[in-house]
């Protein structure tokens, strides 16, 4: 079994060396793996994804009618406008105090 494991490890190392290197005719061998490794699906990551999907689904379930969608969008836009005005006032205050340095 150890000999088999060693043989597999050697083959993987050889494949990794040859990956992306053109042969004598200029062809590049395409493998199953991508260039970047895929993030492993840990339990914490899968829980975060499930939580995000559940939150999104719960919001959609609450909004059954078109007018509810419109109202929620309008509320969201109102919140964004309010935050923008607050930020604008804060910047004006900093400019008045000559402490505003955007860069």
Curated annotation (Swiss-Prot):
GO BP term, pick one: rRNA processing
Region (Disordered): 1-25
GO cellular component, one term: CURI complex
Domain of life the protein comes from: Eukaryota
Basic and acidic residues: bias regions: 1-19
Keyword list, A-Z: Coiled coil
Record Gene3D superfamilies: 6.10.250.1770
Coiled coil: 71-100
Any Pfam family: RRP7
Family designation: Belongs to the RRP7 family.
Name of the protein: Putative ribosomal RNA-processing protein 7 homolog B
Organism from which the protein derives: Homo sapiens
């Amino acid at each position: 079994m150890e000999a088999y494991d060693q043989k597999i490890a050697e083959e993987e190392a050889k494949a990794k060396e040859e990956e992306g290197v053109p042969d004598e005719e200029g062809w590049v061998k395409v493998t199953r793996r991508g260039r970047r490794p895929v993030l492993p699906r840990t339990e914490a990551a899968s829980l975060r994804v499930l939580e995000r999907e559940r939150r999104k689904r719960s919001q959609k379930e609450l909004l059954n009618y078109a007018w509810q969608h419109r109202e929620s969008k309008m509320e969201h836009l109102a919140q964004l406008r309010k935050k923008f005005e607050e930020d604008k006032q804060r910047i004006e205050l900093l400019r008045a105090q000559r402490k505003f340095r955007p860069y």
